[in-house]
């Protein structure tokens, strides 16, 4: 479960992804919206940091998904089934969805850590396609959260930081 954020602009995020991940982001975004809208129990996913990150900011996630669909369509990737499901969810839930962007987008350090850890992970997934992100691997901002866990996170999740601060 993931929403890749290698840029601060949703359109730039979509433009920067390879076709495989771009198409998957539409589906995963839908799944996250479904969980947040109470239309899916979500099981353990409801506590996943990618889900929690968008809680209360579903309209921001909607904008992210719209950008993914727009670029997928420009690239000739079929999105009809996903769009049909998204439209149905939108029509049922739009009024209950929260504001556009999560507060952490106003924190320059958090944003840099998110963008950099996402770029580093994309580079590690496909070094050829994401060669332009290679410098993210050694960037000081490539500092995932929870480094002391048995299996440290690969990404920086602001919701983990907030949760850990409360403990």
For each predicted feature, which ranges?
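Sequence termini and other peripheral, non-core segments
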Residues: 1-45, 51-167
């Amino acid at each position: 479960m993931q929403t890749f954020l290698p840029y601060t602009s949703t359109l730039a995020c979509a433009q920067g992804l390879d076709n495989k991940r771009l198409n998957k982001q539409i589906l995963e975004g839908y799944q996250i919206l479904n969980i947040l809208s109470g239309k899916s129990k979500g099981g353990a996913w409801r506590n996943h940091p990618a889900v929690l990150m968008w809680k209360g900011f579903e309209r921001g996630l909607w904008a992210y998904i719209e950008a993914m669909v727009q670029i997928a369509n420009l690239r000739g990737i079929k999105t009809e089934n996903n769009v049909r499901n998204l439209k149905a969810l939108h029509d049922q839930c739009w009024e209950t969805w929260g504001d556009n962007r999560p507060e952490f987008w106003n924190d320059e350090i958090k944003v840099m850590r998110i963008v950099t850890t996402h770029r580093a992970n994309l580079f590690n997934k496909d070094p050829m396609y994401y060669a332009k992100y290679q410098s993210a691997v050694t960037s000081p901002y490539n500092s995932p959260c929870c480094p002391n866990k048995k299996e440290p996170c690969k990404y920086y999740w602001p919701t983990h930081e907030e949760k850990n601060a409360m403990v």
